[in-house]
Protein backbone atom coordinates (compact mmCIF):
# COMPACT_ATOMS: atom_id res chain seq x y z
CA UNK A 1 0.00 0.00 0.00
CA UNK A 2 1.39 3.37 -0.87
CA UNK A 3 1.52 5.81 1.96
CA UNK A 4 0.45 9.34 1.38
CA UNK A 5 1.61 11.97 3.80
CA UNK A 6 0.57 15.57 3.70
CA UNK A 7 2.05 18.24 5.86
CA UNK A 8 0.92 21.71 6.70
CA UNK A 9 3.35 24.46 6.23
CA UNK A 10 3.35 27.53 8.30
CA UNK A 11 1.07 30.12 6.91
CA UNK A 12 0.88 33.77 7.62
CA UNK A 13 -1.58 34.92 10.20
CA UNK A 14 -5.03 35.49 8.74
CA UNK A 15 -4.49 33.40 5.63
CA UNK A 16 -7.42 31.51 4.25
CA UNK A 17 -7.59 27.74 4.56
CA UNK A 18 -7.37 27.35 0.82
CA UNK A 19 -3.96 29.02 0.77
CA UNK A 20 -2.29 26.59 3.22
CA UNK A 21 0.82 24.74 1.98
CA UNK A 22 0.63 21.00 1.45
CA UNK A 23 3.33 18.39 0.74
CA UNK A 24 2.37 15.10 -0.87
CA UNK A 25 4.78 12.15 -0.77
CA UNK A 26 4.16 9.02 -2.73
CA UNK A 27 4.09 8.75 -6.43
CA UNK A 28 4.44 12.48 -6.93
CA UNK A 29 4.55 15.85 -5.22
CA UNK A 30 2.11 18.67 -5.18
CA UNK A 31 3.02 22.00 -3.73
CA UNK A 32 1.14 25.14 -3.06
CA UNK A 33 1.81 26.20 -6.63
CA UNK A 34 -1.24 24.22 -7.68
CA UNK A 35 -3.37 26.49 -5.52
CA UNK A 36 -3.56 29.25 -8.06
CA UNK A 37 -5.00 32.63 -7.23
CA UNK A 38 -8.29 31.65 -8.78
CA UNK A 39 -8.65 28.82 -6.25
CA UNK A 40 -7.62 31.07 -3.45
CA UNK A 41 -10.32 33.43 -4.57
CA UNK A 42 -12.71 30.50 -4.64
CA UNK A 43 -12.17 29.81 -0.95
CA UNK A 44 -12.40 33.43 -0.02
CA UNK A 45 -15.65 33.83 -1.95
CA UNK A 46 -17.25 30.89 -0.28
CA UNK A 47 -16.14 32.14 3.08
CA UNK A 48 -17.83 35.50 2.48
CA UNK A 49 -21.05 34.24 0.92
CA UNK A 50 -24.27 34.77 2.77
CA UNK A 51 -24.52 31.25 4.07
CA UNK A 52 -26.31 31.03 7.40
CA UNK A 53 -26.50 27.89 9.48
CA UNK A 54 -29.87 26.84 10.79
CA UNK A 55 -28.41 24.44 13.31
CA UNK A 56 -26.31 25.08 16.38
CA UNK A 57 -23.67 22.39 15.64
CA UNK A 58 -20.04 23.55 15.79
CA UNK A 59 -17.97 23.83 12.66
CA UNK A 60 -16.22 20.78 11.37
CA UNK A 61 -12.82 22.42 11.45
CA UNK A 62 -13.18 22.88 15.18
CA UNK A 63 -13.21 19.15 15.61
CA UNK A 64 -10.37 18.62 13.18
CA UNK A 65 -8.05 20.71 15.36
CA UNK A 66 -8.29 18.26 18.22
CA UNK A 67 -9.20 14.80 16.91
CA UNK A 68 -7.89 12.12 14.63
CA UNK A 69 -10.39 11.10 12.04
CA UNK A 70 -11.03 7.83 10.33
CA UNK A 71 -13.44 7.55 7.43
CA UNK A 72 -15.99 4.75 7.37
CA UNK A 73 -19.34 4.35 5.69
CA UNK A 74 -22.57 3.70 7.64
CA UNK A 75 -26.27 4.65 7.54
CA UNK A 76 -27.49 8.03 8.80
CA UNK A 77 -25.47 8.83 11.82
CA UNK A 78 -25.67 9.84 15.45
CA UNK A 79 -23.69 12.72 16.83
CA UNK A 80 -21.56 11.91 19.84
CA UNK A 81 -19.31 14.71 20.98
CA UNK A 82 -16.54 13.66 23.38
CA UNK A 83 -14.53 16.10 25.40
CA UNK A 84 -11.74 17.67 23.44
CA UNK A 85 -8.20 16.68 24.24
CA UNK A 86 -4.88 18.01 23.34
CA UNK A 87 -3.97 18.79 19.79
CA UNK A 88 -2.88 15.63 18.00
CA UNK A 89 -2.35 14.15 14.63
CA UNK A 90 -5.25 13.31 12.35
CA UNK A 91 -5.17 9.96 10.65
CA UNK A 92 -7.22 8.82 7.70
CA UNK A 93 -6.80 5.15 6.90
CA UNK A 94 -8.19 2.18 5.07
CA UNK A 95 -10.98 3.66 3.02
CA UNK A 96 -12.98 1.04 1.12
CA UNK A 97 -14.41 3.00 -1.74
CA UNK A 98 -16.54 0.18 -3.02
CA UNK A 99 -18.29 0.09 0.38
CA UNK A 100 -18.67 3.86 0.24
CA UNK A 101 -20.43 3.61 -3.12
CA UNK A 102 -22.95 1.13 -1.75
CA UNK A 103 -24.21 3.59 0.89
CA UNK A 104 -23.94 6.85 -0.99
CA UNK A 105 -26.13 8.31 -3.64
CA UNK A 106 -23.24 9.23 -5.90
CA UNK A 107 -23.09 7.66 -9.34
CA UNK A 108 -20.58 4.81 -9.64
CA UNK A 109 -17.13 5.62 -10.85
CA UNK A 110 -14.60 3.56 -12.62
CA UNK A 111 -11.69 1.98 -10.86
CA UNK A 112 -9.31 4.31 -12.64
CA UNK A 113 -10.94 7.24 -10.89
CA UNK A 114 -10.76 5.59 -7.43
CA UNK A 115 -7.83 6.58 -5.21
CA UNK A 116 -5.67 3.95 -3.69
CA UNK A 117 -6.43 3.07 -0.11
CA UNK A 118 -3.78 4.10 2.29
CA UNK A 119 -3.00 6.30 5.22
CA UNK A 120 -2.72 10.04 5.18
CA UNK A 121 -1.12 11.73 8.19
CA UNK A 122 -1.77 15.36 8.92
CA UNK A 123 0.60 16.99 11.32
CA UNK A 124 0.09 20.45 12.75
CA UNK A 125 2.43 23.07 11.41
CA UNK A 126 4.90 24.68 13.73
CA UNK A 127 4.37 27.22 15.01
CA UNK A 128 0.60 26.86 14.99
CA UNK A 129 -1.33 29.51 13.18
CA UNK A 130 -4.37 31.23 14.68
CA UNK A 131 -6.51 30.07 11.76
CA UNK A 132 -7.91 26.58 11.45
CA UNK A 133 -6.13 24.64 8.73
CA UNK A 134 -8.14 23.35 5.86
CA UNK A 135 -8.68 19.65 5.52
CA UNK A 136 -9.43 17.19 2.81
CA UNK A 137 -12.88 15.77 3.29
CA UNK A 138 -12.75 13.00 0.73
CA UNK A 139 -10.30 11.38 -1.64
CA UNK A 140 -11.15 12.84 -4.96
CA UNK A 141 -9.62 12.05 -8.33
CA UNK A 142 -8.15 15.54 -8.28
CA UNK A 143 -5.19 14.22 -6.23
CA UNK A 144 -4.36 11.62 -8.84
CA UNK A 145 -5.06 13.66 -11.91
CA UNK A 146 -4.08 17.29 -12.15
CA UNK A 147 -6.81 17.85 -14.66
CA UNK A 148 -9.47 17.12 -12.09
CA UNK A 149 -8.85 20.50 -10.50
CA UNK A 150 -10.21 22.09 -13.61
CA UNK A 151 -13.31 19.91 -13.44
CA UNK A 152 -13.78 20.81 -9.80
CA UNK A 153 -13.65 24.48 -10.67
CA UNK A 154 -16.36 24.01 -13.31
CA UNK A 155 -18.57 22.27 -10.78
CA UNK A 156 -18.10 25.11 -8.36
CA UNK A 157 -19.16 27.71 -10.96
CA UNK A 158 -22.38 25.79 -11.60
CA UNK A 159 -22.97 25.40 -7.90
CA UNK A 160 -22.49 29.10 -7.22
CA UNK A 161 -25.05 29.92 -9.90
CA UNK A 162 -27.63 27.62 -8.29
CA UNK A 163 -26.99 29.07 -4.82
CA UNK A 164 -27.76 32.57 -6.07
CA UNK A 165 -31.07 31.43 -7.60
CA UNK A 166 -32.45 29.68 -4.53
CA UNK A 167 -32.27 31.48 -1.21
CA UNK A 168 -34.84 29.58 0.84
CA UNK A 169 -33.02 28.07 3.82
CA UNK A 170 -33.34 24.35 4.31
CA UNK A 171 -32.22 22.72 7.49
CA UNK A 172 -29.61 20.07 6.80
CA UNK A 173 -27.40 18.24 9.24
CA UNK A 174 -23.84 17.20 8.74
CA UNK A 175 -23.07 13.90 7.08
CA UNK A 176 -20.42 12.81 9.59
CA UNK A 177 -20.65 10.86 12.83
CA UNK A 178 -18.21 10.98 15.68
CA UNK A 179 -17.49 8.42 18.37
CA UNK A 180 -14.96 8.04 21.14
CA UNK A 181 -11.77 6.18 20.31
CA UNK A 182 -11.31 2.87 22.14
CA UNK A 183 -9.06 2.78 25.22
CA UNK A 184 -5.38 2.56 24.51
CA UNK A 185 -5.40 4.94 21.61
CA UNK A 186 -2.13 6.83 21.84
CA UNK A 187 -3.71 10.17 21.13
CA UNK A 188 -7.01 11.66 22.19
CA UNK A 189 -9.13 11.21 19.13
CA UNK A 190 -12.58 10.46 17.88
CA UNK A 191 -13.77 8.37 14.98
CA UNK A 192 -15.46 10.14 12.10
CA UNK A 193 -17.62 8.28 9.60
CA UNK A 194 -18.80 9.68 6.33
CA UNK A 195 -22.33 8.91 5.21
CA UNK A 196 -23.78 9.12 1.78
CA UNK A 197 -24.66 12.63 0.66
CA UNK A 198 -28.22 13.74 1.17
CA UNK A 199 -29.91 14.85 -2.03
CA UNK A 200 -31.99 17.92 -1.26
CA UNK A 201 -32.62 21.10 -3.28
CA UNK A 202 -29.67 23.45 -3.36
CA UNK A 203 -30.03 26.26 -0.89
CA UNK A 204 -27.67 28.22 1.34
CA UNK A 205 -26.03 25.67 3.59
CA UNK A 206 -24.51 25.80 7.07
CA UNK A 207 -20.84 26.54 7.18
CA UNK A 208 -18.67 23.49 7.02
CA UNK A 209 -21.29 21.20 5.44
CA UNK A 210 -21.09 19.39 2.09
CA UNK A 211 -22.74 20.39 -1.18
CA UNK A 212 -23.87 17.90 -3.77
CA UNK A 213 -23.99 18.90 -7.41
CA UNK A 214 -24.58 16.29 -10.10
CA UNK A 215 -23.43 13.46 -7.92
CA UNK A 216 -20.18 15.05 -6.69
CA UNK A 217 -19.38 16.53 -3.33
CA UNK A 218 -17.12 19.39 -2.31
CA UNK A 219 -16.17 20.94 1.01
CA UNK A 220 -16.91 24.52 1.94
CA UNK A 221 -14.17 25.97 4.17
CA UNK A 222 -15.46 26.84 7.58
CA UNK A 223 -14.81 30.39 8.80
CA UNK A 224 -13.15 30.90 12.12
CA UNK A 225 -15.82 30.63 14.80
CA UNK A 226 -16.00 30.12 18.51
CA UNK A 227 -15.97 26.48 19.58
CA UNK A 228 -19.36 25.25 20.75
CA UNK A 229 -20.31 22.93 23.55
CA UNK A 230 -19.59 19.24 23.13
CA UNK A 231 -22.59 17.88 25.06
CA UNK A 232 -25.05 17.24 22.18
CA UNK A 233 -27.30 14.15 22.44
CA UNK A 234 -27.84 11.79 19.56
CA UNK A 235 -30.09 13.11 16.79
CA UNK A 236 -31.35 11.41 13.65
CA UNK A 237 -31.42 13.34 10.40
CA UNK A 238 -34.95 12.24 9.60
CA UNK A 239 -36.30 13.28 12.96
CA UNK A 240 -34.56 16.63 12.81
CA UNK A 241 -36.03 17.47 9.42
CA UNK A 242 -39.50 16.58 10.64
CA UNK A 243 -39.12 18.80 13.70
CA UNK A 244 -37.86 21.72 11.67
CA UNK A 245 -40.45 21.41 8.91
CA UNK A 246 -43.44 20.93 11.22
CA UNK A 247 -45.33 24.12 11.95
CA UNK A 248 -46.11 24.65 15.61
CA UNK A 249 -49.87 25.35 16.04
CA UNK A 250 -50.67 28.66 17.61
CA UNK A 251 -52.64 28.60 20.88
CA UNK A 252 -56.38 29.21 20.54
CA UNK A 253 -57.53 32.75 20.96
CA UNK A 254 -59.64 33.67 23.95
CA UNK A 255 -61.62 36.24 22.07
CA UNK A 256 -62.99 33.87 19.41
CA UNK A 257 -64.70 30.91 21.07
CA UNK A 258 -66.04 28.04 19.01
CA UNK A 259 -69.73 27.26 18.57
CA UNK A 260 -69.51 24.77 21.43
CA UNK A 261 -68.79 27.69 23.80
CA UNK A 262 -71.85 29.80 22.95
CA UNK A 263 -75.00 30.24 24.99
CA UNK A 264 -77.90 28.20 23.60
CA UNK A 265 -80.35 30.99 24.48
CA UNK A 266 -78.74 34.28 23.45
CA UNK A 267 -75.47 33.27 21.76
CA UNK A 268 -73.16 34.93 24.29
CA UNK A 269 -69.98 33.26 25.57
CA UNK A 270 -70.76 30.26 27.78
CA UNK A 271 -68.17 28.51 29.92
CA UNK A 272 -70.17 25.50 31.11
CA UNK A 273 -73.63 23.99 31.39
CA UNK A 274 -76.34 25.32 33.67
CA UNK A 275 -79.57 23.43 34.38
CA UNK A 276 -78.82 20.91 31.63
CA UNK A 277 -77.86 23.32 28.80
CA UNK A 278 -74.72 25.32 27.97
CA UNK A 279 -75.76 28.87 28.80
CA UNK A 280 -74.13 32.13 29.79
CA UNK A 281 -74.18 33.54 33.30
CA UNK A 282 -76.87 36.07 32.41
CA UNK A 283 -79.38 33.52 31.10
CA UNK A 284 -78.57 31.18 34.00
CA UNK A 285 -79.40 33.86 36.56
CA UNK A 286 -82.52 34.93 34.68
CA UNK A 287 -83.82 31.35 34.55
CA UNK A 288 -83.06 30.73 38.23
CA UNK A 289 -84.78 33.91 39.41
CA UNK A 290 -87.83 33.20 37.28
CA UNK A 291 -88.27 29.68 38.64
CA UNK A 292 -87.57 30.55 42.27
CA UNK A 293 -89.97 33.50 42.29
CA UNK A 294 -92.53 31.76 40.06
CA UNK A 295 -92.62 34.93 37.99
CA UNK A 296 -95.24 35.39 35.27
CA UNK A 297 -94.31 37.42 32.19
CA UNK A 298 -96.42 38.91 29.41
CA UNK A 299 -95.23 39.45 25.83
CA UNK A 300 -96.27 42.79 24.35
CA UNK A 301 -95.74 41.52 20.80
CA UNK A 302 -96.60 38.22 19.07
CA UNK A 303 -94.64 35.93 21.43
CA UNK A 304 -91.85 35.52 18.89
CA UNK A 305 -89.44 38.27 19.91
CA UNK A 306 -85.78 37.75 18.91
CA UNK A 307 -83.56 36.66 21.79
CA UNK A 308 -79.87 37.37 21.25
CA UNK A 309 -77.01 38.96 23.13
CA UNK A 310 -78.16 42.49 22.32
CA UNK A 311 -81.94 42.07 22.68
CA UNK A 312 -82.27 39.39 25.34
CA UNK A 313 -83.53 41.86 27.98
CA UNK A 314 -86.31 43.33 25.87
CA UNK A 315 -88.91 40.57 26.34
CA UNK A 316 -88.71 38.41 29.45
CA UNK A 317 -91.56 36.17 28.30
CA UNK A 318 -89.86 35.15 25.05
CA UNK A 319 -86.52 34.75 26.80
CA UNK A 320 -87.98 32.36 29.38
CA UNK A 321 -89.83 30.41 26.70
CA UNK A 322 -86.58 30.01 24.77
CA UNK A 323 -84.86 28.78 27.93
CA UNK A 324 -87.47 26.04 28.17
CA UNK A 325 -87.28 25.33 24.44
CA UNK A 326 -83.53 24.67 24.47
CA UNK A 327 -83.95 22.18 27.31
CA UNK A 328 -83.33 24.01 30.60
CA UNK A 329 -84.96 22.03 33.44
CA UNK A 330 -86.93 23.89 36.09
CA UNK A 331 -86.74 21.02 38.56
CA UNK A 332 -82.96 21.39 38.76
CA UNK A 333 -83.22 24.88 40.25
CA UNK A 334 -82.62 24.69 43.99
CA UNK A 335 -85.01 26.27 46.43
CA UNK A 336 -84.14 29.27 48.56
CA UNK A 337 -83.09 27.04 51.46
CA UNK A 338 -80.45 25.33 49.32
CA UNK A 339 -79.44 28.30 47.20
CA UNK A 340 -75.75 28.24 46.38
CA UNK A 341 -75.02 25.15 48.51
CA UNK A 342 -74.11 21.79 46.98
CA UNK A 343 -74.67 18.78 49.19
CA UNK A 344 -74.63 20.78 52.45
CA UNK A 345 -77.31 21.49 54.99
CA UNK A 346 -79.09 24.82 54.61
CA UNK A 347 -77.90 27.55 56.91
CA UNK A 348 -79.90 30.26 58.60
CA UNK A 349 -81.52 32.74 56.23
CA UNK A 350 -79.49 35.84 55.50
CA UNK A 351 -82.40 38.23 55.97
CA UNK A 352 -85.72 37.94 57.85
CA UNK A 353 -87.67 38.69 54.66
CA UNK A 354 -86.67 35.39 53.07
CA UNK A 355 -87.36 32.60 55.58
CA UNK A 356 -88.12 29.17 54.19
CA UNK A 357 -91.56 27.73 55.02
CA UNK A 358 -91.26 24.78 57.42
CA UNK A 359 -92.36 21.35 56.30
CA UNK A 360 -95.17 20.75 58.85
CA UNK A 361 -97.26 23.75 57.65
CA UNK A 362 -96.82 22.55 54.10
CA UNK A 363 -98.41 19.21 54.99
CA UNK A 364 -101.08 21.02 57.05
CA UNK A 365 -102.13 23.29 54.22
CA UNK A 366 -102.32 20.34 51.87
CA UNK A 367 -104.68 18.57 54.26
CA UNK A 368 -106.83 21.68 54.60
CA UNK A 369 -107.15 22.03 50.85
CA UNK A 370 -108.04 18.37 50.47
CA UNK A 371 -110.73 18.66 53.13
CA UNK A 372 -112.21 21.71 51.42
CA UNK A 373 -112.30 20.10 47.99
CA UNK A 374 -113.92 16.92 49.30
CA UNK A 375 -116.67 18.88 51.09
CA UNK A 376 -117.73 21.00 48.12
CA UNK A 377 -119.88 19.88 45.17
CA UNK A 378 -118.25 19.50 41.80
CA UNK A 379 -119.09 22.18 39.29
CA UNK A 380 -120.20 19.52 36.82
CA UNK A 381 -122.76 18.01 39.21
CA UNK A 382 -124.70 21.11 40.28
CA UNK A 383 -128.49 20.91 40.56
CA UNK A 384 -130.22 23.63 38.52
CA UNK A 385 -133.66 21.94 38.66
CA UNK A 386 -135.12 24.56 40.98
CA UNK A 387 -133.22 27.57 39.66
CA UNK A 388 -135.48 30.42 38.43
CA UNK A 389 -134.38 33.95 37.68
CA UNK A 390 -137.98 35.33 37.48
CA UNK A 391 -138.28 38.45 39.66
CA UNK A 392 -141.97 37.67 40.32
CA UNK A 393 -141.06 34.36 41.99
CA UNK A 394 -140.83 35.92 45.44
CA UNK A 395 -144.50 36.93 45.22
CA UNK A 396 -145.72 33.43 44.35
CA UNK A 397 -146.15 30.41 46.62
CA UNK A 398 -146.75 30.04 50.33
CA UNK A 399 -144.43 31.35 53.04
CA UNK A 400 -144.27 27.93 54.65
CA UNK A 401 -142.55 26.52 51.55
CA UNK A 402 -139.86 29.17 51.66
CA UNK A 403 -139.31 28.68 55.41
CA UNK A 404 -139.09 24.93 55.04
CA UNK A 405 -136.59 25.37 52.19
CA UNK A 406 -134.54 27.58 54.51
CA UNK A 407 -134.46 24.93 57.23
CA UNK A 408 -133.62 22.18 54.73
CA UNK A 409 -130.61 24.08 53.37
CA UNK A 410 -129.25 24.60 56.89
CA UNK A 411 -129.63 20.99 57.99
CA UNK A 412 -128.21 19.67 54.72
CA UNK A 413 -125.09 21.80 55.10
CA UNK A 414 -124.60 20.81 58.74
CA UNK A 415 -123.61 17.19 58.03
CA UNK A 416 -121.26 18.19 55.20
CA UNK A 417 -119.52 20.82 57.32
CA UNK A 418 -119.10 18.36 60.19
CA UNK A 419 -117.41 15.91 57.85
CA UNK A 420 -115.07 18.71 56.71
CA UNK A 421 -114.16 19.60 60.34
CA UNK A 422 -113.21 16.03 61.14
CA UNK A 423 -110.59 16.08 58.31
CA UNK A 424 -108.69 19.02 59.78
CA UNK A 425 -105.36 17.74 61.22
CA UNK A 426 -105.41 17.94 65.01
CA UNK A 427 -109.14 18.67 65.36
CA UNK A 428 -110.11 15.12 66.25
CA UNK A 429 -107.35 15.05 68.89
CA UNK A 430 -109.29 17.57 70.95
CA UNK A 431 -111.79 16.43 73.56
CA UNK A 432 -115.21 15.49 72.15
CA UNK A 433 -116.93 18.22 74.11
CA UNK A 434 -114.57 20.82 72.70
CA UNK A 435 -115.13 19.49 69.17
CA UNK A 436 -118.92 19.85 69.49
CA UNK A 437 -118.64 23.27 71.06
CA UNK A 438 -116.35 24.59 68.34
CA UNK A 439 -118.51 23.15 65.55
CA UNK A 440 -121.87 24.37 66.86
CA UNK A 441 -120.51 27.82 67.65
CA UNK A 442 -119.05 28.28 64.17
CA UNK A 443 -121.68 26.52 62.06
CA UNK A 444 -123.52 29.63 60.84
CA UNK A 445 -120.21 31.38 60.18
CA UNK A 446 -118.98 28.44 58.13
CA UNK A 447 -122.30 28.23 56.32
CA UNK A 448 -122.07 31.87 55.22
CA UNK A 449 -118.33 31.77 54.43
CA UNK A 450 -118.49 28.67 52.24
CA UNK A 451 -121.67 29.86 50.52
CA UNK A 452 -120.11 33.25 49.74
CA UNK A 453 -116.96 31.65 48.29
CA UNK A 454 -118.84 29.27 45.96
CA UNK A 455 -121.58 31.61 44.74
CA UNK A 456 -121.63 34.09 41.87
CA UNK A 457 -123.01 37.33 43.27
CA UNK A 458 -122.85 39.15 39.94
CA UNK A 459 -125.36 36.78 38.34
CA UNK A 460 -127.26 36.29 41.61
CA UNK A 461 -126.49 32.54 41.76
CA UNK A 462 -126.22 30.94 45.19
CA UNK A 463 -124.58 27.49 45.30
CA UNK A 464 -125.21 25.51 48.49
CA UNK A 465 -123.31 22.58 49.97
CA UNK A 466 -125.60 19.92 48.52
CA UNK A 467 -125.16 21.31 44.98
CA UNK A 468 -128.51 23.06 44.77
CA UNK A 469 -128.36 26.33 42.79
CA UNK A 470 -130.93 29.04 43.56
CA UNK A 471 -131.35 32.61 42.49
CA UNK A 472 -131.06 35.31 45.12
CA UNK A 473 -134.74 36.23 44.71
CA UNK A 474 -135.72 32.65 45.44
CA UNK A 475 -134.17 32.93 48.93
CA UNK A 476 -135.57 36.31 49.99
CA UNK A 477 -138.78 35.01 51.64
CA UNK A 478 -136.94 32.30 53.54
CA UNK A 479 -133.69 34.11 54.50
CA UNK A 480 -135.20 37.58 54.77
CA UNK A 481 -132.74 40.47 54.83
CA UNK A 482 -129.98 38.08 55.82
CA UNK A 483 -129.59 36.96 52.18
CA UNK A 484 -128.71 40.50 51.08
CA UNK A 485 -125.91 40.67 53.64
CA UNK A 486 -124.62 37.26 52.45
CA UNK A 487 -124.54 38.38 48.79
CA UNK A 488 -122.73 41.60 49.70
CA UNK A 489 -120.16 39.69 51.73
CA UNK A 490 -119.70 37.26 48.83
CA UNK A 491 -119.00 40.13 46.44
CA UNK A 492 -116.37 41.65 48.74
CA UNK A 493 -114.74 38.28 49.38
CA UNK A 494 -114.36 37.41 45.71
CA UNK A 495 -112.92 40.81 44.93
CA UNK A 496 -109.93 39.85 47.08
CA UNK A 497 -109.03 36.99 44.70
CA UNK A 498 -108.38 34.52 47.50
CA UNK A 499 -106.89 31.24 46.34
CA UNK A 500 -108.12 27.90 47.58
CA UNK A 501 -105.21 27.41 50.00
CA UNK A 502 -105.71 30.72 51.77
CA UNK A 503 -109.48 30.18 51.91
CA UNK A 504 -109.00 26.73 53.45
CA UNK A 505 -106.93 28.31 56.24
CA UNK A 506 -109.51 31.07 56.82
CA UNK A 507 -112.31 28.50 57.07
CA UNK A 508 -110.34 26.46 59.62
CA UNK A 509 -109.58 29.57 61.69
CA UNK A 510 -113.29 30.44 61.73
CA UNK A 511 -113.93 27.24 63.69
CA UNK A 512 -110.67 26.71 65.63
CA UNK A 513 -110.78 29.78 67.83
CA UNK A 514 -111.33 30.69 71.45
CA UNK A 515 -114.83 29.88 72.71
CA UNK A 516 -116.43 30.15 76.13
CA UNK A 517 -116.63 26.81 77.91
CA UNK A 518 -113.67 24.94 76.30
CA UNK A 519 -112.20 22.05 78.29
CA UNK A 520 -108.64 22.45 76.96
CA UNK A 521 -108.26 25.94 75.52
CA UNK A 522 -104.44 25.60 75.37
CA UNK A 523 -104.62 22.79 72.84
CA UNK A 524 -107.10 24.77 70.78
CA UNK A 525 -104.77 27.76 70.88
CA UNK A 526 -101.81 25.64 69.71
CA UNK A 527 -103.80 24.32 66.77
CA UNK A 528 -104.92 27.85 65.96
CA UNK A 529 -101.30 29.10 65.93
CA UNK A 530 -100.28 26.34 63.53
CA UNK A 531 -102.99 27.32 61.09
CA UNK A 532 -102.13 31.02 61.38
CA UNK A 533 -98.44 30.34 60.66
CA UNK A 534 -99.39 28.16 57.74
CA UNK A 535 -101.53 30.95 56.28
CA UNK A 536 -98.79 33.51 56.87
CA UNK A 537 -96.14 31.43 55.09
CA UNK A 538 -98.45 30.74 52.20
CA UNK A 539 -99.38 34.36 51.70
CA UNK A 540 -95.76 35.51 52.01
CA UNK A 541 -94.14 33.10 49.56
CA UNK A 542 -96.82 31.90 47.17
CA UNK A 543 -99.45 34.57 46.87
CA UNK A 544 -97.49 37.75 46.25
CA UNK A 545 -97.76 38.83 49.88
CA UNK A 546 -94.45 40.73 49.64
CA UNK A 547 -96.07 43.10 47.15
CA UNK A 548 -99.28 43.38 49.28
CA UNK A 549 -98.16 43.87 52.87
CA UNK A 550 -101.74 44.30 54.22
CA UNK A 551 -103.16 41.29 52.44
CA UNK A 552 -102.89 38.96 55.45
CA UNK A 553 -104.58 41.52 57.69
CA UNK A 554 -107.47 41.84 55.26
CA UNK A 555 -107.91 38.09 55.20
CA UNK A 556 -108.02 37.82 58.97
CA UNK A 557 -110.34 40.85 59.04
CA UNK A 558 -113.07 38.76 57.38
CA UNK A 559 -113.48 36.69 60.55
CA UNK A 560 -115.12 39.52 62.58
CA UNK A 561 -117.50 40.14 59.66
CA UNK A 562 -118.55 36.50 59.87
CA UNK A 563 -119.41 36.99 63.53
CA UNK A 564 -121.75 39.82 62.56
CA UNK A 565 -123.36 37.73 59.82
CA UNK A 566 -123.77 34.86 62.27
CA UNK A 567 -125.65 37.16 64.64
CA UNK A 568 -127.97 38.18 61.78
CA UNK A 569 -128.64 34.50 61.10
CA UNK A 570 -129.55 33.85 64.72
CA UNK A 571 -131.92 36.80 64.62
CA UNK A 572 -133.62 35.33 61.52
CA UNK A 573 -134.08 31.96 63.22
CA UNK A 574 -135.42 33.66 66.35
CA UNK A 575 -137.96 35.60 64.25
CA UNK A 576 -139.12 32.39 62.50
CA UNK A 577 -139.57 30.70 65.87
CA UNK A 578 -141.73 33.57 67.02
CA UNK A 579 -143.75 33.49 63.80
CA UNK A 580 -144.28 29.74 64.36
CA UNK A 581 -145.38 29.03 60.79
CA UNK A 582 -143.05 26.04 60.51
CA UNK A 583 -141.52 24.40 63.61
CA UNK A 584 -137.70 24.35 63.36
CA UNK A 585 -135.84 21.02 63.29
CA UNK A 586 -134.49 19.83 66.63
CA UNK A 587 -130.88 20.26 65.54
CA UNK A 588 -131.57 23.84 64.47
CA UNK A 589 -133.42 24.54 67.71
CA UNK A 590 -130.52 23.15 69.77
CA UNK A 591 -128.05 25.09 67.66
CA UNK A 592 -130.02 28.26 68.29
CA UNK A 593 -130.14 27.77 72.04
CA UNK A 594 -126.45 26.81 72.34
CA UNK A 595 -125.14 29.74 70.33
CA UNK A 596 -127.13 32.54 71.90
CA UNK A 597 -124.74 35.21 73.18
CA UNK A 598 -126.95 35.86 76.24
Curated annotation (Swiss-Prot):
Broad class of the protein's primary localization: cytoplasm
Bias (Low complexity) ranges: 8-22
Subcellular location: Cytoplasm; Nucleus
Any one GO BP annotation for this protein: regulation of transcription by RNA polymerase II
ZnF locations on chain (NR C4-type): 263-283, 299-318
Feature: DNA-binding region: 260-335
Cellular component aspect of the GO annotation: cytoplasm; nucleus; transcription regulator complex
Family under the similarity heading: Belongs to the nuclear hormone receptor family. NR4 subfamily.
Listed name of the protein: Nuclear receptor subfamily 4 group A member 2
Protein's organism: Bos taurus (Bovine)
Organismal lineage: Eukaryota, Metazoa, Chordata, Craniata, Vertebrata
